[in-house]
Each structure stands twice: as C-alpha cells, then as structure tokens.
Amino acid sequence: MRVSKYLLSTQKETPANAEVISHQLMLRAGMIRRNASGLYSYLPTGLRVLRKVEAIVREEMNKAGAIEILMPMVQPADLWVETGRWDKFGPELLRFKDRHNRDFVLGPTHEEVITDLIRKEVSSYKQLPLNLYQIQTKFRDEVRPRFGVMRSREFLMKDAYSFHLDVDTMNETYEAMYQAYSNILSRMGLAFRPVLADTGSIGGSMSHEFHVLAQSGEDLIAYSTGSDYAANIEKAESPMPTEARGSATEELRLVDTPNAKTIAELVEQFGLDITKTVKTLIVKGATEEAPLVALIVRGDHELNEIKADKLDLVASPLEFAPEALIRDAIGAGPGSLGPVGLNMPIIIDHSVSVMSDFAAGANQDDKHYFGINWERDLPLAQAADIRNVVEGEPTPDGLGTYAMARGIEVGHIFQLGTNYSKSMNATVLDENGKSQVLLMGCYGVGVSRIVAAAIEQNFDDRGIVWPEAIAPFSVGILPMNMHKSHRVTDIAEQLYKDLSAAGIDVLLDDRKERPGVMFADMELIGIPHTVVIGDRNIDAGVFEYKNRRTGEKQDVPFDQIVDFLKNLQA
C-alpha cells in the first residue's frame, strides 16, 4: 500500500474527550472516528487491525471444530419473551417496532436466536454434539459508553454456541474452547490470563473469563504465585482461617465515638488495630420474615457483592438498605452499626468468626462497643465467604499465595446447561427415542475490544507498538527525499515490489513530506519494522532497519533485506 493512495488520517494532538490511552491512540492513529455516543466508523488502518484479529479468531474456531454461520442482528421480541429476558434484560436492550407494529430488538447477544434455530433444525442425537459460531455486530444501549471501542454501544463479537445431550461432550467442547481462546490470544502476542468467573446475567454453571493484562484494566484479577490458578476478584475464594478464636481478655464496654463515622477514623482516634474491628452492612433480605440482613466483614476487608448476592437469605440482585430504612429498623445510621443486640439475621465472613476482643458499632449513633467476644456477648453468627481476597493470602489450590493484576476482559466461556433450551423447549430424541432437553455452552470473544486491549498493553510515548500478528502493516518503507532522488525512488519502488511479492504487508510512504513527519506517523500507527532508504545508505549498499518495539537499528545489505524481514515474522 502506498500512503499517497491511502487514507492515513493521523493527528498530532490528543483528543480532549478520550479518557484511556487506547481511545486516544486509535483516534490519533486514524483508526476510528466517532459518529455518535458509543458509535464509531473504522478507517482503513483500524479496519486492517480488526480484520487481522477476526482472521485469527476464525482460524482457531475452525481448528477447534466449530462451524461458522451468520444470524441477524435484528431479532423478534417473541423469542426474548419466551426466555423471560424481554423483561429481565433492562434498558441495554434496544427495542423497536417495525411498520407492522411488531416488536423487535437489536441483538446484544444471540442465545434466543440460536436456540430457536437449533430446535427447528436438529431433531436427533445423531446430529450432536454441534458447535456453531458467528462473527457479528452486537448492540447494547449502554447508559454511558466510555473508553472508545472498549465500551461502545455497537461492537463486533465472535459468539459460539454448542449443543449436547450429555455432560461429557459439553465438557469436551468447553475444554476445546478454552484452548482455542488461549491460542487466539497467544497468537496475537498478548499477555493474558484465563480466570474463574461469575456467570453473570447469562447464567449457567462453569465459567471462565480471558483477560488481557493492562494497568488500565477495569477488572481486578487474583492469581496464584505458584500455579495457574486465577480468578476474577468476584469469584476468588477466600482462605478459611487456620487459627483458633482467641480467648476473651477484655470486658465489653460502650464507648462514645462522636467523630468516628468510618473504620479509618475509629482506628486513628482510638489507636485500634484495624484487624480488631468489623464493618456491618445492611442489605435487603429475600423473605418477608427477614426483610433486612446484616453482613459483617473485618475492618480491613471489603464485602464481595457477587458472593453476598448468592446467599439464600439475601435478596437478589443485592440491594443495600437505604439509611431511612436502617434507622427505622435499628435506631442508628451507617457508621454506628454492629452485631450486638441486632434483631435480624447476621451473616459474618469466616475471618470474623475467629475474632476476639473486637470493636463494632453499638447500634446507637456516635457509640461503639469495644471488647466484643462471640458466645459471651452474642451467639456466633452464621459464617460464609463474603469478602474479597487479599494479596499474600494462600490460594485454594495450596500452591502459592494471591497476587493481584488488572485485566481487560476480552473473552468469556460458559456452560449454560438447560437455561435456554428448557424455556424454549429445544429437545431432540435420544438413542432410545425419548425426548431430551439440550445442554448448551456459550463462548464469546470481543473482537473489537481486543483491538483496544492490545493497545492498552502495547504503547509508548510515541504511539502504538503493535504485536506482529495484528499490526496494520508489518513493514514501513521510508524513502528520504524520494521526490528529489531517482536512486532513492528506484530502490524504494523495487523494495516495495519485492516485499509485496514475498507476502509481506508493506506501507510505502511516498508523500512529499518532511522525514520527521514520516517517522512520527510510522511510530504512531505502530508498524513493527521500518526500512529507511537514503542516498547515504545507497552509497553503502545497505538499508537502515529499525525495530519499533526495541528501538534497535542495524544496517542490512540490499540482497538480504527480504529474507531478513521474513525471518523476523516467522
């Protein structure tokens, strides 16, 4: 490709409304342009990257035995009513009527459509197992689209759906998809971690997320320093206490604490050890008999809302009680709450169950109890894992301790079971002629999100530093003063032809432009390899090669340059 015949829409200035580096660089590198909130057009450079990501995803899915199809983005509302998600999904589901007053949606996902398709097309166990995928545009009407294509309303996604009659083949397909996703991200040259995850709104049992590691990642990943264990912070298991509860050494006493509204203030003002304090949080209960439930974690720990949401006594989705309701039920507000004398179900974290001589709110404004002890001052409450893990704690496999990293979720695989097939009556006849409800798996990759995540992991102060496999071009040719030197022109043109013939994606900057601008554009768009041609190089019979990632420069003889660049791509 010649720059003179290409739309290279680079910008010097960083756009003011771009919050994260990937959004900034995708705009500056001329990859995308905003049409409306959460809606973007891909320019040639951006589309080249997107298509390379898409090609790797497609190759690995095909290699894993999945079959490509294509389903409509517009879906009939009847299918969503059938599964109950018409009412459950919320405002992210964009609904509209056609000219015949029939309800439709713009698909944020395709479980309903694929299940409807399979129940009509598959009738016998002989047709199973089956794994179908598509690479299709999705639309979610995000309340606040952010971060460019990282969280846009319209995005490109690969979604696959597998169908089974038995758990064994469902597990086999799940493992195949796990490996395919690992292959996809490895081939793209990205540092990533597969992590145990919550199944979220889609539902199901087994679930893993695939995270590209980046400091800007929204998700916190807890991983083992001694094994492959990793989990989203929402899912990471807290270790059970190994120590026994200490004996009481203090008397229970009521203390005035007028200026201590938080744990931090309480600890500072009274010189307490934060591990000897607890936080009491009031949430709505699941039953009329227990409309409120108290959740208690140690003062230095954080409540894990996903874990709390799964407790039988707690209403789902988790909802914290408003202050007015708390005051009406307890007589005190947040900041002065505690377990002593509390007349509602109490669930404590396992770490709280072994505490002694601890401090908590007294359920009176501006007062706390110090020296609280279980089974002396109050019965030992029901214990559960309801907190986030902490760095340095032992991991569940016993092979290391927790460390933390931030990640950007780019893939998610689920075992859905019969969540959709049962509600939509998707059945087949088994080998005994009996009707059986299909088991399902669901496997998604954010194709456009990978592009942004790759940038978040690969950039410097000059621009993007693309991994080889997904760079818009592999090689950039920079002829110095091409329009003033016939020698430079002839050699640049010949190198362009030779590299193109060798199957290398090459961009020849044939503009009448200053060298500084040419170098800046090549570095901004992140081309991995640059070849500089000037009269001085020609006199020496060499090209000047520069590696974008390392900054390394070296002279390469004319007759060796093609093989040299091909070997770098191998």
Curated annotation (Swiss-Prot):
Known role: Catalyzes the attachment of proline to tRNA(Pro) in a two-step reaction: proline is first activated by ATP to form Pro-AMP and then transferred to the acceptor end of tRNA(Pro). As ProRS can inadvertently accommodate and process non-cognate amino acids such as alanine and cysteine, to avoid such errors it has two additional distinct editing activities against alanine. One activity is designated as 'pretransfer' editing and involves the tRNA(Pro)-independent hydrolysis of activated Ala-AMP.
GO CC terms in record: cytosol
Any Gene Ontology biological process: prolyl-tRNA aminoacylation
Family statement drawn from the similarity comment of this UniProt entry: Belongs to the class-II aminoacyl-tRNA synthetase family. ProS type 1 subfamily.
EC number: 6.1.1.15
Encoding gene, per UniProt annotation: proS
Assigned keywords, A-Z: Aminoacyl-tRNA synthetase, ATP-binding, Cytoplasm, Ligase, Nucleotide-binding, Protein biosynthesis
Record protein name field: Proline--tRNA ligase
An annotated Gene Ontology molecular function: ATP binding
Disulfide bonds: none
Cleavable signal peptide: none
UniProt catalytic activity: tRNA(Pro) + L-proline + ATP = L-prolyl-tRNA(Pro) + AMP + diphosphate
Domain of life: Bacteria
Domain notes: Consists of three domains: the N-terminal catalytic domain, the editing domain and the C-terminal anticodon-binding domain.
Summary of subunit composition and partner proteins: Homodimer.
Subcellular localization(s) per the UniProt record: Cytoplasm
